[in-house]
């Protein structure tokens, strides 16, 4: 399941573009997640009151959380699979405190791919998409393994 050096380079190249506007990308990822999978919104007490896409777009808190999500993921991606130190606290909080099912990580991974595709189509061709999908699968696989260590079947 590991990525080649070339695949990691594709992932990190496109991630550099994401980092130029983490707030915009992050908000768009969360909106896409919540609109595509409304059940995910139930895990976010802070955002449950946001019913329309316009309310979500106007939410500074949603933007801040989007930055938090993408910053954490970016730190993990930059480790090129050697992300134990970064992954463990994230998995622990998501398993024991937030109780986020692994399936929701799949949903947000899909939203990330879709947002990058919509914002950076010219830089996110088939090879880069395949590499990013592989990197996000590795992330989810390792999160699921950590969940089990924390006794959460998610």
Swiss-Prot record:
Residues carrying Phosphothreonine: 68
Limits of the Globin domain: 2-148
Predominant cellular place of this UniProt entry's protein: cytoplasm
Subcellular locations according to the entry: Cytoplasm, Sarcoplasm
Residues bound to O2: 65
Enzyme class: oxidoreductase
GO MF annotation list: heme binding; metal ion binding; nitrite reductase activity; oxygen binding; oxygen carrier activity; peroxidase activity
Catalytic activity: Fe(III)-heme b-[protein] + nitric oxide + H2O = Fe(II)-heme b-[protein] + nitrite + 2 H(+); H2O2 + AH2 = A + 2 H2O
EC number, as in UniProt: 1.7.-.-, 1.11.1.-
Keyword Heme: yes
InterPro entries registered for this protein in UniProt: Globin (IPR000971), Globin-like_sf (IPR009050), Myoglobin (IPR002335)
Annotated binding of nitrite, by residue: 65
Domain of life of the native organism: Eukaryota
Binding site for heme b: 94
Biological processes per GO annotation: removal of superoxide radicals
GO CC terms, sorted: extracellular exosome; sarcoplasm
Family affiliation: Belongs to the globin family.
PANTHER family noted in UniProt: MYOGLOBIN
Protein task: Monomeric heme protein which primary function is to store oxygen and facilitate its diffusion within muscle tissues. Reversibly binds oxygen through a pentacoordinated heme iron and enables its timely and efficient release as needed during periods of heightened demand. Depending on the oxidative conditions of tissues and cells, and in addition to its ability to bind oxygen, it also has a nitrite reductase activity whereby it regulates the production of bioactive nitric oxide.
Assembly information from the UniProt record: Monomeric.
Name this protein carries in UniProt: Myoglobin
């Amino acid at each position: 399941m590991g990525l080649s050096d070339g695949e990691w380079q594709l992932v990190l190249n496109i991630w550099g573009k994401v980092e130029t506007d983490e707030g915009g990308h992050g908000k768009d990822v969360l909106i896409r997640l919540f609109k595509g999978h409304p059940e995910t919104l139930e895990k976010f007490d802070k955002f449950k009151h946001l019913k329309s896409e316009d309310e979500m777009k106007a939410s500074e808190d949603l933007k801040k959380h989007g930055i938090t999500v993408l910053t954490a993921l970016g730190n993990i991606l930059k480790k090129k699979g050697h992300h134990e130190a970064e992954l463990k606290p994230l998995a622990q909080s998501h398993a024991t405190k937030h109780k986020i099912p692994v399936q929701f990580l799949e949903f947000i991974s899909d939203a990330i791919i879709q947002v990058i595709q919509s914002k950076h189509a010219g830089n996110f061709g088939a090879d880069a998409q395949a590499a990013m999908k592989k990197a996000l699968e590795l992330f989810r696989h390792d999160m699921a393994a950590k969940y089990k260590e924390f006794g959460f079947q998610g």
